[in-house]
């Protein structure tokens, strides 16, 4: 008999069932049959007991904390942030022609890095090919060499704590359209083939490129007066 309906875990008895003694008697056994499965599977209810909700939230919170704390920094970046490094920065021909030299230099100065080498230089083809030798197999290599040798470049050597990784962040992504606002490429460039500036991608390459672009006597070792306010 249709004397009982269930909403959630609570039985609802119709008014017609209450008015009939016979209905009430025949309904009792079916109540046990319907209620027992709900009681057994109470964890399927829409509203779980608070204790279970809090327990699951706490476990998720602890798990997220564990995941967060183990992925803050990459090991090689942590190490580089504690060491004084050298990096090679080059303002490419488009940056020179557009009058961006002062703007780009000021960004590194304001960051607190030390300029140890600076010159305006017309790059010969052989030097450009040596500098970009890792890209020789790329189809755009000839065009890249023509671009770098098309006009004067500004060669710079910079020194500072974690300067390689930090300079890469200041410069921004290779494709200026993907570079963050506030970065040099994000603010001053629009195309990969005219992305204004080059920066070393590792401490080892920083040393190699400085040695490649600067000759003996072209680097200056000095101590800025503000250095105690920049480095502990």
Curated annotation (Swiss-Prot):
PROSITE patterns according to UniProt: NDPK, NDPK_LIKE
InterPro entries: NDK-like_dom, NDK-like_dom_sf, Nucleoside_diP_kinase, Nucleoside_diP_kinase_AS
Subcellular location per the Swiss-Prot or TrEMBL entry: Plastid, Chloroplast
Reaction catalyzed: a 2'-deoxyribonucleoside 5'-diphosphate + ATP = a 2'-deoxyribonucleoside 5'-triphosphate + ADP; a ribonucleoside 5'-diphosphate + ATP = a ribonucleoside 5'-triphosphate + ADP
Active site residues according to the UniProt entry: 198 (pros-phosphohistidine intermediate)
One family name in Pfam for this protein: NDK
Source taxon at top rank: Eukaryota
Protein name: Nucleoside diphosphate kinase 2, chloroplastic
């Amino acid at each position: 008999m249709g004397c009982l309906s269930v909403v959630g875990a609570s039985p609802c008895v119709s008014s017609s069932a209450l008015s009939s003694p016979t209905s009430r008697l025949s309904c009792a056994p079916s109540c046990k049959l319907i209620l027992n499965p709900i009681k057994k599977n109470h964890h399927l209810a829409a509203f779980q007991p608070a204790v279970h909700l809090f327990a699951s939230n706490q476990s998720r919170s602890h798990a997220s904390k564990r995941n967060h704390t183990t992925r803050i920094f990459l090991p090689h970046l942590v190490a580089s942030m504690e060491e004084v490094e050298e990096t090679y920065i080059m303002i490419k021909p488009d940056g020179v022609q557009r009058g961006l030299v002062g703007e780009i230099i000021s960004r590194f100065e304001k960051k607190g890095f030390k300029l140890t080498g600076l010159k305006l230089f017309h790059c010969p083809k052989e030097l450009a090919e040596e500098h970009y030798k890792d890209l020789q197999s790329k189809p755009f290599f000839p065009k890249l060499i023509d671009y770098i040798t098309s006009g004067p470049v500004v060669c710079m050597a910079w020194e500072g704590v974690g300067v390689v990784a930090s300079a890469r962040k200041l410069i921004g992504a290779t494709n200026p359209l993907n570079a963050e606002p506030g970065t040099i490429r994000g603010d001053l460039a629009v195309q990969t083939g005219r992305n204004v500036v080059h920066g070393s991608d590792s401490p080892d390459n920083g040393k190699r490129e400085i040695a490649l672009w600067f000759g003996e006597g072209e680097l200056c070792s000095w101590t800025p007066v503000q250095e105690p306010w920049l480095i502990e």
